[in-house]
Amino acid sequence: LGTVLVFIGIYLAKKNMLKKFRKNLLQLVLIIFFLYFLLLVFLYFYQRNLLYHPNENNYSDDKILVDIKKVKIPTSDNIELLGWYHEKNLINYKTLIYFHGNAGSLENRIHKLNHFQDMNINFLIIAWRGFSGNKGKPTEQGLYEDGKSAINWLVKKGIDEKNLILYGESLGTGVATYLAQ
């Protein structure tokens, strides 16, 4: 009889431990689910801040070595984009449109633009809406519109679309790829 009582005691203890384990596991799963839900809510409401960094500045006082002309490029939704345009020879050289990344301003790209000085190329770099003092807020559709506006501006100057090179850096790569299709 004593052995039976010991086995019953062990059985009840294991059953109680199993119940406690299941309860703790359920609590842990619920906590993890709740934290995951909070993360999703945070990402939803702060996604713009995570994607676009127009005020970040790692400008290192580079001096621009190429002659640029500051231009204003109108968009179809009445935003004027700041651009820097360098023209060597529209007839003999292709024109590169530089779509920059998700952080900083035009000044942050001076070191890259200086590499173009020895190339037989014209170029235009634009600042996205919300960047470099431009009005508006960056959105995916807005960036596509900015890119189309840059192309249209060059076409109005008499540049054939076949003579355009779309160059994207980081975020600008998506825009360049979209517009190249």
State each model region's role.
Residues 14-34:
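N-terminal Sec-pathway targeting helices
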Residues 35-72:
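An N-terminal hydrophobic leader/cap segment in hydrolases
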Residues 80-153:
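Membrane-embedded segments
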Residues 168-172, 176:
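Gly/Ala-rich beta-loop-alpha elbow adjacent to hydrolase catalytic centers
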Residues 179-180:
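Aromatic pocket-lining residues of Rossmann-like dinucleotide-binding sites
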